[in-house]
C-alpha cells in the first residue's frame, strides 16, 4: 500500500521533526525536503497530498532570508505555512498547529488517508526489498543494536537465507549481548549468522591507549577490517544492508541547518567491496524503528535496548582499557540495569549506564584497607539528545544498587552518582 504523504519544506525551523512526527502520529506519512525543491521534483514524489512551508529562526543563510520557489504556491497541492513571514499562502500559522487544526488540514483539506502504520510499512518494505534484491545475496553487519536488529529481522522476513548477518564481538559489549544476538537470530529466526569473537584482537590493539579519540579510531578501523575479512570469505554478495534511519538523513543537513553531520553507517570498506545499499528503515524515526521491531516479533529487550555508542564499553572504561576494569564495568552495568528494571525505572529513564575511571580509590574490605575501582552511575532524560537532564533517583534505590555492586563486584571500592546535566557535560564521558 502506498501511503499518502505530506511534504514539509525546511525554511529554517528547529521543529521540522516535531511537525513531521505530529503528522505521522495522526496516521499520515510525512517527509522533510529542502526549501528550494522544484515543482517537478515535488510531483515526482509518491502520493503527495499537501505541502507545509515551515519557517523559523534559521531562515537567514549567509545574510539572506531563504524563500521557496514561487511556483510552489500554484503547484496544485494544498499549501499552508508555519512561522514564515515571507509566505504567500492564504492560510498561515505563527506557530505549529494543534492536533485538531492539523487533522482538519490533513483529512478535510488534503483528503489524505490515515494509512501510515507499521503493519503497512513492513508489508511495503518486504515487497520493495524483494523487488530490489531479486535472487541476489545481502550482507549485514549485525551489532545487536536496535537499528541493525530490526533491519535483520525485516530482511530475514523478506529474503530469508539470501541474507548473511555478521556479528563481531569486539569484547566491548554489555553482559550477554552477543549471546542474545546468537540466540535470537541464529536459533529463533534461523538466519545465516556468522559470529566472530574478536575480543583478543580488539583488546590487544587497545592495550595502553588512553586517548578517547584514538580508542574510537582503533575500534572503528578494526571493526571494518574484521568485517572486510568476513565479507571476502563469502561469494555472490551484491548488496549491503544498513540500519540507516530518517534522523541520519535529516542530520546530513540542508542549507538552513546549523549543525551538519555527515551521514554514514558501515562506511570505510575498500573500493573492491562496494555494494548496492539496502536501507529499509530510512523512512523511520527511532521510536518508529522500535514499533517496527515489535511488529516483526523481536523480543522486548532487543527492541527497547538503550542507545549504545559504536565503540561500546570502550568509551565507558575511561582511559587505557584493562580486562579487569572492563569486567568491573560490565558487571556493574548489568546490576544497574537489573535494579532499574526491578523498580520500573527502565521505562522512565531515557539512558542509564555505569562508567569506570582509570584510577583506584581506597576502601575497606574484610576489615582491611583495600584499593578498588570507582563506579560512576549516569542516568539522564532527553527528548533529542541535544540537551539532557539528570534523573532524580530515590536514595534508597541508589543505596541498594551501591550495596549490590560493592558486594558482587569485589574489585570496586565505591559507587558515585553523577548529576551534571547537558550542557555543561555530554551524556557520555568520552
Predicted segments — roles?
Residues 1-238, 253-430:
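RNA-binding accessory domains that recognize and position tRNA/RNA substrates
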Residues 242-244:
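Extended catalytic-interface subdomain
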Amino acid at each position: 500500500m502506498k501511503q499518502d504523504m505530506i511534504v514539509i519544506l525546511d525554511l529554517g525551523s528547529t521543529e521540522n521533526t516535531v511537525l513531521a512526527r505530529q503528522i505521522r502520529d495522526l496516521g499520515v506519512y510525512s517527509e522533510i525536503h529542502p526549501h528550494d525543491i522544484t515543482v517537478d521534483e515535488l510531483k515526482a514524489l509518491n502520493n503527495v497530498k499537501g505541502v507545509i512551508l515551515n519557517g523559523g529562526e534559521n531562515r537567514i543563510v549567509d545574510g539572506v532570508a531563504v524563500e521557496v520557489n514561487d511556483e510552489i504556491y500554484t503547484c496544485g497541492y494544498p499549501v499552508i505555512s508555519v512561522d514564515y513571514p515571507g509566505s504567500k499562502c492564504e492560510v498561515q500559522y505563527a506557530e505549529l498547529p494543534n492536533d485538531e487544526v492539523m487533522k482538519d488540514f490533513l483529512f478535510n483539506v488534503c483528503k489524505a488517508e490515515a494509512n501510515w502504520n507499521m503493519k503497512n510499512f513492513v508489508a511495503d518494505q518486504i515487497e520493495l526489498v524483494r523487488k530490489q534484491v531479486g535472487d541476489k545475496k545481502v550482507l549485514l553487519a549485525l551489532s545487536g543494536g536496535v537499528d541493525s536488529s530490526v533491519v535483520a529481522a525485516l530482511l530475514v522476513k523478506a529474503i530469508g537465507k539470501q541474507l548473511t548477518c555478521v556479528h563481531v564481538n569486539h569484547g566491548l559489549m554489555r553482559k550477554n549481548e552477543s549471546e542474545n544476538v546468537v540466540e535470537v537470530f541464529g536459533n529463533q529466526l534461523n538466519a545465516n549468522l556468522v559470529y566472530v569473537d574478536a575480543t583478543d584482537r580488539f583488546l590487544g590493539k587497545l592495550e595502553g591507549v588512553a586517548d578517547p579519540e584514538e580508542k574510537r579510531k582503533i575500534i572503528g578501523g578494526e571493526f571494518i577490517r574484521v568485517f572486510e575479512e568476513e565479507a571476502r570469505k563469502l561469494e555472490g554478495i551484491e548488496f549491503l544492508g544498513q540500519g540507516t534511519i530518517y534522523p541520519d538523513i535529516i542530520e546530513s543537513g540542508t542549507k538552513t541547518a546549523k549543525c551538519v553531520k555527515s551521514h554514514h553507517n558501515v562506511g570505510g570498506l575498500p573500493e573492491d567491496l562496494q555494494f548496492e545499499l539496502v536501507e529499509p528503515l530510512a523512512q523511520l524515526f527511532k521510536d518508529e524503528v522500535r514499533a517496527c521491531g515489535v511488529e516483526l516479533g523481536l523480543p522486548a529487550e532487543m527492541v527497547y535496548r538503550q542507545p549504545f555508542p559504536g565503540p561500546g564499553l570502550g568509551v565507558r572504561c575511561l582511559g587505557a582499557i584493562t580486562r579487569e576494569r572492563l569486567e568491573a564495568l560490565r558487571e556493574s552495568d548489568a546490576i544497574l540495569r537489573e535494579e532499574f528494571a526491578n523498580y520500573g525505572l527502565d521505562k522512565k529513564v531515557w539512558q542509564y549506564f555505569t562508567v569506570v575511571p582509570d584510577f583506584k580509590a581506597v576502601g575497606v574490605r574484610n576489615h582491611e584497607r583495600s584499593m578498588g575501582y570507582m563506579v560512576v552511575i549516569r542516568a539522564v532524560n532527553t527528548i533529542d539528545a541535544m540537551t539532557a537532564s539528570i534523573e532524580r533517583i530515590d536514595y534508597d534505590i541508589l543505596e541498594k544498587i551501591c550495596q549490590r555492586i560493592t558486594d558482587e563486584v569485589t574489585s570496586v571500592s565505591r559507587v558515585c552518582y553523577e548529576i551534571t546535566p547537558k550542557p555543561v557535560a555530554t551524556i557520555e564521558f568520552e
